[in-house]
C-alpha cells in the first residue's frame, strides 16, 4: 500500500525508498513485530478467558507436559496471521498477484486450522476436523492458488527445476495442478506436525521464510537470476516483503511462545504458515529446494509416516513416540535441548538450500 508514496519522490526524494524491496522488507519486519508485541497480551488474555481449559494435552506424551502445558490457550496463530496480514498490506505492492495468492492460502489454511482448533478446544479432544474433510479443504484452497499462478504467472510456472543441476527443467504441464497443490498441502501439514514444543516450529518457519525471501528477491531480479542461472520470475521479488512480515510476526510470537509458553500457535498458525511457505516455493519455482530448507519439517512428517506404517505392518513402533521430537524427549532430552538442537538443524539446512543457488 505504501508503495504509492514513491510516486511523490519528485517532490520529496526520500520517498523513493518505497520503491525498494529491501527497504519495504525491513518495514514489514518491524511492523509485524510491533503489531504482535502490542496486541499480543490482549489477544492472549481474551483467548485464555474464552477457552478455559486451553488446548488438550496428549496423555501418552511426556508427563512433564501435563504439568507445564495444561491450561495454556491455543489459536495463537491469530496473533501471527493478523500481524503478517496488516504488515503485508502496508508494505507490499498490492498490484502484485503473487502477494494475493500467498495471502489467499495463508487465510484459507488459517481458517481451516482455526476450525480444527475450535473443535478440539470446545470438545476437549484431539479429534478436531476430520482428516479427509480437512485435506479436501486444504487441497481445494491450494488448487485455486495454483490455477491462479498458472493463469497469471510466466510460461515457466508449470516447470520444475532441480537444485544443483544447471539447465535441466521439466515442464509439468497440467500435472502442475496436482504437483503444486501437493507441495502446498504437504508443507502446511509438515509444519503442523512440527509444532509440538514451545518455540519448536516458529523459529524454523522464520529461518525458512528468510531463506525464501532471499531466493524470491534473486528470482525476481533479471540480473541476479541470469547470473545464477535460475528461472526469472517477474514480480516474485515482492514475496520477499511477505517473507519479512513472517519473520517479524514470528519474532513477536516467540516472545510469548518461549518456554514456558503463554500461548500455542495451534493449527491456526502452523497450518497457515506451512501453506504460505509452500506457496512461496511454488511461486518462485524452488519447490525442490523447499525439501532441503524445510528438511526439519520433512523429517517430522517422515517419522510419523514410518511409525504408522511400521505399526500397521509389524505391530512394532520404530520410535518411542512420533513425531520425532517426542522420541528424543522420551530418550531423556529436555524440551529446551530438543528445541534448540532442532533450530540448529533448521539453520544448517537453510544454508545448504541457499548453497544450491550457486551449485549450477
UniProtKB/Swiss-Prot annotation:
EC number from the UniProt entry: 2.7.8.13
GO biological process: cell division; cell wall organization; peptidoglycan biosynthetic process; regulation of cell shape
Cell location: Cell inner membrane
Protein name: Phospho-N-acetylmuramoyl-pentapeptide-transferase
Gene name of this polypeptide: mraY
Keywords: Cell cycle, Cell division, Cell inner membrane, Cell membrane, Cell shape, Cell wall biogenesis/degradation, Magnesium, Membrane, Metal-binding, Peptidoglycan synthesis, Transferase, Transmembrane, Transmembrane helix
CDD domains (alphabetical): GT_MraY
NCBIfam families the UniProt entry points to: mraY
